[in-house]
Amino acid sequence: MFSLRTAQPAQSLFRAATNTYSTSLPRSAIAARSFATVQSDIFKPTKYGGKYTVTLIPGDGIGTEVAESVKTIFKADNVPIEWEQVDVSGLDAGNKHSEDLFKESIASLKRNKLGLKGILHTPVERSGHQSFNVALRQELDIYASIVLIKNIPGYKTRHDNVDLCIIRENTEGEYSGLEHQSVSGVVESLKIITRAKSERIAKFAFSFALANNRKKVTCIHKANIMKLADGLFRSTFHKVAESYPTLETNDMIVDNASMQAVARPQQFDVMVMPNLYGGILSNVGAALVGGPGIVPGCNMGRDVAVFEPGCRHVGLDIKGKDQANPTALILSGSMLLRHLGLDEHANRISKAVYDVIGEGVTRTRDMGGQASTHEFTRAVLDKMESAL
């Protein structure tokens, strides 16, 4: 795997980024900046006049509120980014305006190569409408989802010493969108697993593990029942593992993995899995360390990288109430900055967020506090100013 900015192997860049962890920041705040491809350096973010142009898709629900928090913090820190905002919504999916905005968001991401994204709502009751979130990942082939699950210092949860990474294949599996009603009352839904994409995500997971000084990679599957589909994923994983003899490997059935994650999450390091299992275990993992409001994530492809909260929660129930926790999107934005090599900005912003949470004075309701979104953002800004 190579850097997105140079032909230098990304491993050294990962390590350079994670070195900061030893000072004050959790490793989740020091996520590696350059892991879009395991093949070649073809990633060229757009930069004009000394600034990077980044696509911003606030998303539905609390998206606009937390996106404003990120924009305010980035502006205060003079981050060299210009936002190209596209207000696409999944709530209005199906009408021409919404479809046009979705196409505009795709074009923007193809042009800029980088995006910061909230979560787009997918109506459960609307038949025939594919999730915009899934369609975007498939259209751009951003095949690897990375969710970083780690305790925040000073914020006590049920488990201590949790530090794991969930890597999820983003473009096939049960999310292929191939389902139909053959006769009334009988639905067929197709799960697609290919050797090529299983191999690609396995190589990504092993490369990520090496680059971030991780020790073990676990394959999550249901090959005891889906012997062909998950059997192919599992066997491909073990074949790829032969090229990484320094890493410990094992595999685990998803039912057991869910139980083990709740009972003893410390046993996991890097976990790689098909699409559906990744969605489930990302949410389980978030619950271990404080909930969806604090877990950052990103989606990587060969040409485009999109950073978004690790748990794909829309938050329609608290929309407009100034109650949302912006931490997940802020930290996802910090990951984006490291991806660009803007480590100084990323470190300053991440440290301020973790210091505010660690002090316990200004926390949003999901973390047991009473602070509003604006109050939390103001506290982060104050921390950044006091550090100068």
UniProtKB/Swiss-Prot annotation:
Q: Which Pfam families did the record assign?
A: Iso_dh
Q: Which reaction does it catalyse?
A: D-threo-isocitrate + NAD(+) = 2-oxoglutarate + CO2 + NADH
Function comment: Performs an essential role in the oxidative function of the citric acid cycle.
Q: What class of enzyme is it?
A: oxidoreductase
Q: Where in the cell is it found?
A: Mitochondrion
The family annotation for this protein states: Belongs to the isocitrate and isopropylmalate dehydrogenases family.
Cofactor binding note of this UniProt entry: Binds 1 Mg(2+) or Mn(2+) ion per subunit.
Q: Where is the transit peptide?
A: 1-35
The identity of this protein, by name, is: Isocitrate dehydrogenase [NAD] subunit 1, mitochondrial
Q: In which organism is this protein found?
A: Ajellomyces capsulatus
What NCBIfam families has UniProt attached to this entry?
Answer: mito_nad_idh
Chief localization class? mitochondrion
E.C. numbers: 1.1.1.41
Annotated binding of substrate, by residue: 137, 168, 255
Where does the record place the site Critical for catalysis?
175, 222
BP GO annotations: isocitrate metabolic process; tricarboxylic acid cycle
Positions that bind Mg(2+): 255
